[in-house]
Amino acid sequence: PILKIDSEGNVVASFGGGLMLFPHGLHVDPDGNVWVSDARGPDEEDLSQAGKGHVVIKFSPEGEVLLTLGEGGVAGDGTGATLNTPCDVAVGPDGSIYVGDGHEGQNTDDPSTVARIAKFSADGELIASWGRWGSGPGEFKTPHAVLFDSQGRLVVADRGNNRLQILDQEGNFIEEFKQFSRPSDMHFGLDGMIYVADSESAFNPSPNPGWTPGIRVGSLEDGSVSYFIDGAIEGHDRYPDGSNPEGVAVDAAGNVYGAVVSRGGAMVRSVRQ
């Protein structure tokens, strides 16, 4: 389910339980609606999973399902409105919906793997689709997170290529930044700085040798990195306890929260003010 937690860590609301297999990306639009991507498909041997996964769901602030993108339980081929392990979702300045589609690109050398941005109208009709698996400009190896900057540019955490890509709203490549390490998630603070979470650089073997997992804070104006919140601990297990912030958010008071994957499950930790 989706959990709403207050500043003291208390769960104050819960919704969406049983609707999703792997709730992955989360976006709250200006109206308070909650968008969630379900980045996994059903296990054919588990009948309880039938018809679930491969979708993006829009919830009202109270948890009512308002819209579904994709077809539940059906994996798309990267060309139409049917999605395939969608990673993340963001609503653009004009109300269009942008989905980072394809979670498996970083784990394969198959160029047919889905790795794209799918653009939908506000009522869920596919408008356009761009990108493919690869490492060139406008190509992706897992578009793991998406969001818009203050200029209306689409920022993509192209995790498998260890970079942020900046695109316009029609998918045209503008620039890239590799100094934010291997990005799993991003958030813009009220100060205009971008906060980028790296959850994988300490894996063994490392997909990003020489880099330390954590949260890098900087500017997309000049690409500078001003601060680093260390997420590493001793050892190089895939999911070491207390490390690897895969999600990041900043509240109005400037507190930084890391969503941490660990052996015991997951947790949210306030890591800096």
Model-derived features: where do they sit?
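Sequence-structural signature of mature extracellular/luminal beta-sheet repeat domains
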Residues: 1-273
